[in-house]
């Protein structure tokens, strides 16, 4: 029987323009420095299809002509487009297949994975209705203290990045 390797997942959730992408960039930079092979998945929650990466290129033409899956590879980089009804479980399987060590997900607010919530305003926490929160990151200058036993960090605090990385590496924070 094959052993299933652990595959830590952490979600970063928050409202639009709350700073999710900037925070994720900081995590990715530090993970890269530490040799962690971190996958990153973003949910396009704004309606419609995401913008194409290959506008007007051959793979875009293949897609327009009816291909369900197109890809282009060069210098070890693969760009893949697949027209399917993707559920999160299937996307996670894809990242595992690609042999990443762990996965950082932006969005998919209702998914059951451990979440770091990015807040512009304290009131956003209740409005998000997120479950399985492991930490809160706030952006305002005013100091926010612990919330219901959860660790709370300012967005500029490097310890916030360390906390998320420890979760992704399967370490206790």
UniProtKB/Swiss-Prot annotation:
Keywords: GTP-binding, Molybdenum cofactor biosynthesis, Nucleotide-binding
An annotated Gene Ontology molecular function: GTP binding
Signal peptide per UniProt: none
Keyword Endoplasmic reticulum: no
Pfam families found in the cross-reference section: MobB
Keyword Phosphoprotein: no
Binding-site list for GTP: 17-21, 51-56, 99-101
Any Gene Ontology biological process: Mo-molybdopterin cofactor biosynthetic process
CDD domains associated with the record: MobB
Alphabetical list of InterPro entries matching this protein: MGD_biosynthesis_adapter, MobB_dom, P-loop_NTPase
Similarity field: Belongs to the MobB family.
Function: GTP-binding protein that is not required for the biosynthesis of Mo-molybdopterin guanine dinucleotide (Mo-MGD) cofactor, and not necessary for the formation of active molybdoenzymes using this form of molybdenum cofactor. May act as an adapter protein to achieve the efficient biosynthesis and utilization of MGD. Displays a weak intrinsic GTPase activity.
The protein's name: Probable molybdopterin-guanine dinucleotide biosynthesis adapter protein
Organism: Bacillus subtilis (strain 168)
Lineage of origin: Bacteria, Bacillati, Bacillota, Bacilli, Bacillales
Gene name tied to this protein: mobB
């Amino acid at each position: 029987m094959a052993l299933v390797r652990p595959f830590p997942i952490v979600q970063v959730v928050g409202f639009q323009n709350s700073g999710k992408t900037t925070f994720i960039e900081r995590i990715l930079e530090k993970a890269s420095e530490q040799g962690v092979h971190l996958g990153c998945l973003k949910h396009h929650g704004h309606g419609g299809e995401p913008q194409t990466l290959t506008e007007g290129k051959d793979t875009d033409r293949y897609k327009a002509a009816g291909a369900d899956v197109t890809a282009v590879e060069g210098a070890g980089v693969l760009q893949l487009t697949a027209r399917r009804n993707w559920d999160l479980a299937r996307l996670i399987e894809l990242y595992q297949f690609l042999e990443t060590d762990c996965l950082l997900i932006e969005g998919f607010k209702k998914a059951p994975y451990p979440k770091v919530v990015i807040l512009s305003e304290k009131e956003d926490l209740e409005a998000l209705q997120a479950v399985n929160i492991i930490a809160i990151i706030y952006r305002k200058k005013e100091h926010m203290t612990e919330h219901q036993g959860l660790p709370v960090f300012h967005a500029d605090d490097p310890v916030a990045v360390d906390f998320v990385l420890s979760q992704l590496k399967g370490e206790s924070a």
